[in-house]
Amino acid sequence: MKGHIYKRGATYTYVVDLGKDPITNKRRQKSKGGFRTKKEAQAALAEILTEYHRGTYINESEITLKEFVKKWLELYSSTGKVKISTIRVRVHETNNILKYFKQVKLKDITGTMYQDFLLYLNTKFAENTLLGIHRTARMIFKKAVELKYIKSDPTQYSVIPKKQKTVAELESEEEIPKYFEKEELLEFLDTVKKLANPQYYTIFLTLAYTGMRIGELCALKWKDIDFKDKEIKIYKTYYNPTNNTIKYTLLPPKTRTAKRNVSIDDTLIKELKKHKTRQNKLKLTSWHDEDFVFTKIINYPGYPETPKQIELKMAQILKKSNIATLLTPHGLRHTHASLLAQAGVRLQEIMDRLGHQDDNITRNIYLHVTKDMKKEALQKFSKLMQNL
């Protein structure tokens, strides 16, 4: 760090070279004038240089929060460690931050201002949304401190406001998500077989027999299926926010536990082999051959089938069926969890199979199903004792 002094009219000014901006790579300088004597300017310059060499000097930038957020997003996106879908979430959350602070300078945002911001969010958004925005804000201000744009982090001592839950919200927490009973699942699959293209039968059978997410199913490739060892390797998910068939992306799973091997039975193996035979007969010279298991057939043949199309097809089939329970494809994941619980599989094993680290929905389904099983066991015991 270097500095010099020059005379400007009747007063003296010092200029300090602060090196290059870590984000823009441009040269940064700090100057201050109005000193009556050269000696006063030298003393002020010496104080700054001493702080700099001690590592305690920070030249707070005049940059606005909006300008810094733009730079932060560029840095955040360029690491190669963050998924596209996560970046989109961060962009959305920064928009909420900037709507509130508008053109405020980064250095002018205080802890009190940030706490007021959280109180404002608490009146507008659900708790999970508030927490997401807060996480993003903390990342932004932490990076600003790290890069010496500001001296302190205004989010550091903030307190997350809590809403008192309503009776309706407390009741909804206890609600069990919808799923098919065994008889309903069999009827649904039978209806699919009668009314839809054979590929859809294989799709819904795979979802119901593995509990995989619909994005995991759409990303599935034949190389992921080991027919010999009877298992499917799950390590990626389909991402297509624009729903443009040819502009899809395959992303790694969000969590470590989502990467897993799922055992499959002979029923599913037999159906997958039949599906592969049908697919091989359909392949044409225009086929987009990227080894996908479930693909478009007429338009864009070979491209992976989309979650939206599978959801639409399931809704159409349910309307034509006699099944009262209306589900989305994700409901087949809940169905799989409930059937495993009925079969006596332990909760942790179910969560491992579904790729969950911790999931209240799966736990609620498990407790609901096993509670009914315990009641049934007690009834059988009571009946036995009455017959003695």
Label the model's feature ranges.
Residues M1-T11:
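Short N-terminal "domain-start" leader segments
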Residues G9-T13, L18-T112, T277-H288:
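N-terminal DNA-binding module of tyrosine recombinases/phage integrases
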Residues G33, T37, S61, L73-Y149, ...:
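N-terminal core-binding DNA-recognition domain of tyrosine site-specific recombinases/integrases
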Residues L121, Y179, T206-L207, L339-L340, ...:
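Short alpha-helical segment immediately N-terminal to, or the first helix within
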Residues E127, L131, E146, I150-S152, ...:
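Basic, Lys/Arg- and aromatic-enriched nucleic-acid-binding interface segment
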Residues D190-Y200, T210, V262, R278-D289, ...:
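Short, basic (Lys/Arg/His-rich) helix/loop patches that form interaction surfaces
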Residues D224-E231, A324, V345-I365, K375:
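Short, polar N-cap/turn motifs at the start of nucleic acid-interacting alpha helices
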Residues D229, N240-T242, K247-K259, S263-L268, ...:
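C-terminal secondary-structure termini that scaffold catalytic or DNA-interacting sites
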